């Protein structure tokens, strides 16, 4: 896909540094390179040269690298200017490049052009942003695997399997007199369809599980700590974060707002949220804090309900705002006062109970191990790839279409089954961008940084 305009942006983070990069891509790149450097852009050449303004005054000296189309990141002619990392110098260069016919790039526009020109599929393009934003080594390795195409290859394999199944079903519908639909056999009950659907569902289940692990690696877990006032919620946050992040006092109601802290737990990123104590209150500020606590709980992946083990109360009702799919851990704190030992139990209703002391640290390892387990730590993360919530939703939609197709086959409505398979394939193609709306592309690439 040829773009009529040339784009440019500063590709390195804002602020001063040893080196800064201005990136240019598009049809005017060669002309811009020659006007700015006085050099004719050649392949496999790195030039150390002055960068000049319109009056031939030197803006800086640095390296100019030219990547001709299609052998570049975007698939277009690309120029990189490596200059001193002063924001002033880099803005001089960017302004000069725009004077020569480029325009400032939108966020993610370089990656968008790489996608549109077939250099990356959509999942790989998203992996570029995920690698830049990776908050742990495990997340970075997973993003690299997605960038190398591991996730896309799994999606393509499923897409091809769907293609074969659709081809068989639609051919049988269009040409019922052929060999694959014997007169004595209802082709909708043929083993090819049943076996094909079974294999598809197995592939899909495996990919969906791996994708959920990928989302956890990318996003981490949102862990919300709730409970009545003065049960040790802030102490628990501080203990998990290994810092005095929250104010701890004997005065109930100290925490009025949601306090968040990011923790790296053996490669799993946890966003911990300490919330206001939940109780009846006429204090307007405290009541607002409790409203925010319930709102935060409504977005939780894991809800931790903290109680005082020395004065146990039935507080499970406080978890009422947690989403249905959120994991729930009941922490019985202050065992240093109640005299109980640190331990963990899983009761008959499936609730996880952990007895610990946030003050002394006794039992904290039990909670950390439980959080790691919930995050999928050790679940084949060695070969995990990065993924996003939209990928999980797409695969869930594919599963729904496959279930509907199976029901239509059982009801002998082959045309409707074929339509469900077509829709499943359409949704699957949206993951890699084989089928994508302009709105979807706009939403994805607008979240990228400028210059990428």
Language-model-detected regions and their locations in the chain:
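A glycine-rich (often HGG/GG-containing) alpha/beta subdomain
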Residues: 1-141, 145, 149, 329-330
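Conserved beta-strand segments of alpha/beta enzyme cores
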Residues: 103, 269-271, 352
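Short, acidic/hydrophobic/Gly-rich beta-strand patch recurrent on exposed beta strands
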Residues: 23, 237, 274
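Generic enzyme active-site microenvironment
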Residues: 272, 306, 331
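Conserved G/P- and acidic residue-centered "switch" motifs that form tight phosphate/ATP-binding loops
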Residues: 118, 230, 274
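Switch I (G2) and immediately adjacent beta-strands of P-loop GTPase domains
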Residues: 48-68, 253-281, 299-302
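Inter-motif core of Ras-like GTPase G domains
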Residues: 286-310
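C-terminal-of-GTPase-core extension/linker across diverse P-loop GTPases
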Residues: 1-14, 137-264, 281, 299, ...
């Amino acid at each position: 896909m040829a773009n009529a305009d040339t784009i440019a942006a500063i590709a390195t983070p804002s602020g001063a540094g040893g080196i800064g990069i201005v990136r240019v891509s598009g049809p005017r790149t060669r002309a811009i390179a020659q006007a700015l450097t006085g050099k004719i852009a050649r392949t496999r050449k790195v030039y150390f040269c002055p960068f000049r303004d319109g009056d031939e005054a030197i803006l800086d000296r640095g390296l100019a690298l030219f990547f001709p189309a299609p052998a570049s990141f975007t698939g277009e002619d690309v120029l990189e200017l490596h200059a001193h990392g002063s924001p002033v110098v880099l803005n001089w260069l960017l302004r000069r490049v725009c004077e020569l016919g480029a325009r400032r790039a939108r966020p993610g526009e370089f990656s968008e052009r790489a996608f549109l020109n077939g250099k990356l599929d959509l999942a790989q393009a998203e992996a570029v942003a995920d690698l830049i934003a990776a908050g742990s080594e495990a997340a970075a390795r997973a993003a690299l695997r997605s960038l190398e195409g591991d996730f896309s290859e799994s999606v393509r394999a499923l897409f091809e399997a769907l293609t074969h199944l659709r081809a068989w079903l639609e051919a049988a519908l269009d040409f019922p007199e052929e060999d694959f639909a014997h007169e004595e056999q209802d082709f909708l009950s043929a083993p090819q369809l049943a076996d094909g659907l079974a294999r598809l569902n197995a592939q899909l289940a495996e990919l969906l599980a791996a994708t959920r692990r990928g989302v956890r690696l990318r996003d981490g877990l949102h862990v919300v700590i709730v409970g009545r006032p003065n049960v040790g919620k802030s102490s628990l946050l501080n203990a998990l974060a290994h810092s005095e992040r929250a104010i701890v006092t004997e005065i109930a109601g100290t925490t009025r707002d949601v306090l968040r802290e990011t923790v790296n737990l053996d490669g799993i990123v946890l966003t911990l949220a300490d919330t206001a104590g939940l109780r009846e209150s006429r204090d307007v500020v405290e009541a607002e804090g409790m409203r925010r606590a319930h709102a935060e709980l409504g977005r939780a992946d894991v809800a931790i309900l903290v109680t005082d083990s020395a004065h146990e109360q039935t507080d499970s009702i406080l978890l009422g705002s947690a989403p249905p799919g959120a994991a729930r851990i009941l922490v019985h704190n202050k065992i240093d006062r109640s005299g109980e030992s640190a331990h963990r139990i899983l009761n008959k209703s499936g609730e996880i109970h952990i007895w610990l002391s946030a003050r002394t640290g006794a039992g904290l390892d039990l909670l950390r191990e439980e959080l790691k387990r919930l995050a999928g730590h050790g679940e084949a993360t060695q070969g995990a790839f990065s993924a996003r919530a939209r990928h999980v939703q797409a695969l869930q939609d594919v599963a729904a279409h496959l279930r509907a197709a199976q029901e239509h086959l059982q009801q002998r409505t082959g045309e409707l089954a074929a339509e469900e398979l077509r829709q499943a394939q359409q949704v699957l193609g949206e993951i890699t961008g084989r089928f994508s709306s302009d709105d979807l592309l706009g939403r994805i690439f607008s979240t990228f940084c400028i210059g990428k």
